[in-house]
């Protein structure tokens, strides 16, 4: 989920200009091989990009930047190609691909009220179809049978996990815990939904059955707030991002922080840190695993002074 703070246009422009005058952001699209621990740079961008999806055929990364979606070759990265999303030009970093590689689901801030809603469209671009009538809704998962989307939504003042038919319909509330539940993602066999929740006091990774039953805590990181668990395509591993609890509140996932990427067995067990980097928001919001389950993509950042 990417929370959006609505302030006056003048204040927003002032804040943006001040930040731009002081710093410029370099985004580094990287790959990490979990078998060797090796990190490799795919491409650097002199502006902010977020949340790369690795396409099921292994050929492309799809990411968001400045409200639009782009794709870039995973094998021979050259110039990015913009994906036509029609009227949806305020896409945030919550976008996922169908497992058959034919569709993409996006979260777009609608012009009428600025709230994020979920849409689907062909993966090569096209006119988006509205799925969630209510907002805010932040997409994170698509079931492997293609029948349901899972998302985080604020309804009546609380953020919980919901599912909805992928063609639209009545949404189904899956969690009712006090506080933030976020980042729902289906396991490759469709039996479980992984998500993160503050219900234990810190943000931790949880797992439940796809119908919302048997909600079980999966990480117990005493010094970390752990976000966005992503299951590998073979169903064996989970990677997630974590913040130091002394630097970031449990319900926050800001940009431009020192963070770690952690790896754990999908059936539970002790996680291990596999990378340290400067990032946070936009680094690993959505599933970024390669089809071979040996690598995943992420974005790290570098702030450089304009002075």
List each language-model region with its residue ranges.
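Bacterial Sec-dependent N-terminal signal peptides
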Residues: 1-22
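Sequence signature of WD/YWTD-type beta-propeller architectures
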Residues: 21-307
